[in-house]
Amino acid sequence: MFAPATQPQQQHEQKKQSETVSSAEEDALKWNTDCVYFLASPLTCKKGPECEYRHSEYARMNPRDCYYWLNGNCLNPKCGFRHPPLEGLLGNQGGAPAVSVQPIHATAQHPSVAKQPVPCLFFQKGMCMKGDMCSFLHTPNPAAYKKQHPVEAKPATDPQCSKKPIENNTEEKKLPDVNLSKVVKGHTDISAAPRVASTGLRDSRSVEGYIPNHVGYEPVVQRKGPGFPSFTEGGHSTQLLQKYGSDDNNSFHNGKDADDVLRESSPGFDVLVDNEAGDSEYYHVEDRYGRRSQERGNSEYDPDFSAIADGDKEALREQRFDSYDRREDRGWGHRRVSSEREDRLDRRVYAEDERSENILESDLRYRLAKQRKGNGMRLSVGGHDYAAPDSSMDRGYRESRRDTPRENSISSSRLQGRIKLRERSNGEEGHHFDRRSERGRDRSELPSQGRLRDRIKGRLEENHSGNQERGFGAPWARRREMEDERKSAPKSSREESKPEPSLGKRKSFEEDHHSHKRSRDSFAAPLPFSEILKRKKAAASGGSRNNNKDETISKEEAGDEIKLITEEKTEVVSEPKAEVEEEGTVMEEEEIVGEEVYEGNEDEQAYEGDELNGEYYYEEGYEEEGGEYAYEEGEEVVYAAEEGEEEATEGGEGEGEEDIEKKTVEMLS
């Protein structure tokens, strides 16, 4: 009778225990489930701290759901991920709700992972992501969770009743392990993990070596482990050091210092010339390279001074003053491109100097003036700038030519000794100067000297006044004087049988002043060729009309030759100068190939014959022989000129003008 009485009591107690366990599990489940009202807003939940659901600030800010909670085994009461309500968990009071509470006892009695006897700080803060794979103890804080302690104490009162829930819990725990193996790939078998007795937990630290071998911890170890050696190994470490600019990398470079490395990486000596950061490219072009080097005074890098290493000073002089011919062959396109590229700050600063003092360096007058000047002069030839602000280039060039013959000084002294002033009538001076100005306009159309006229035009008056103060004449004044001296030499040789052979050499200062006044208008706009021919005809006819009172012209048929017989005694006649014109024409045909030939006054020919291959042209017969003029060669020139007169008179005046026009068109085309 005792036995039947005991069975109903046991069943009743079991029911009561199951009810209490189910109610406790339900409370624990609610406590771990997030409040949907709190997730929406902390003010939405009216219960506040008394709410039976979880209010977690971390979960409210974190939109991700807890992976372990969805699988039914989240053991972290302060999990930072969301624990949404699970469907059927509230109604199902069977095994699934008990999973979230009872695995603590199961892991405590049957540890599957070697755990250290240290509580997990991340678990207590709700941020441990390892779950049951953590090597530290996941024990809740008893002060924070007072509701779980009576639930855990009640099953311990009855050992018979406590065994069954524990067995049920262990059986139910196997199901989540199977689910984890399906979802998480690469999980090792829990039974294969080393088992450590409860008495040997304190020795587990030495056995495991602080790094557990379970799978949940492997991704973190593999990320950290190979990462640290990668900074010290060869290839990858150097890439990282170069990427992040390590200071140790500067000590390599094949054992060289930082200064050596910087010097080797410099693209050139002219990178920071004049602190011009925008113009710091490596100049391989000849014009920019030469300009930069001359501004800095480095003549050895300049292409015009390529022979300086040989020590040939004569070659240095020829290269310096013959470089314009070499630059001339390079074409206008390259010159235009280089000039556009040089439109920089220094180009704008020296723009006025370039316009005013751009004179061909092959000109003898410029060379003479340059030697007399105390400071350097800036010039521009073909779009290439040269400047020597400290006159170091000029001084070095003058010192390099101490052993060479003083050709410039000899020619200047010879010219100064022989130049004399002669008188001319106002009518003659006007016509001849107009012809010279017209010839200057025609020559200005040539490409090699196209900009010379415009650049010298604004400098005439300034040079004239400045040179008078310095004590020597301007280049244009010396050129006019040399032209007059050249004209007077053949004429005197032709008229040496007459009582006054030096009559044509005199020139008054008054008319020279008038010619200087007219020279201001000599570089006006170019005139058409028809206008030039008209002026030449008017000058030829006007000269004979103005001097009709003093001249008588007679024709002599012998040899079909026109001879001009002058009867003037005090004034200079104009018609005999036609013979001088023929002299210059014949000489230019013989010695200057391809040059324009004009049948006009000798003053016109002065612009045609004063330069020959970059050197100043002197007529035949003008040679220095003990300070006296050699007239023998000059007489031969006169004879050649008379033959030219004969040929010119036979052709006729109309045919001569047509020939001139044809030749001019061919030269311009």
UniProtKB/Swiss-Prot annotation:
Signal peptide: none
Organism: Arabidopsis thaliana (Mouse-ear cress)
Protein's recorded name: Zinc finger CCCH domain-containing protein 17
GO molecular-function terms, A-Z: DNA binding; mRNA binding; zinc ion binding
Region described as Disordered: 1-23, 150-175, 285-306, 376-589, 642-669
Zinc finger feature spans (C3H1-type): 34-58, 60-86, 114-141
Entries under Pfam families matching the protein: zf-CCCH_2, zf-CCCH_3
UniProt xrefs under Gene3D superfamilies: Zinc finger, CCCH-type
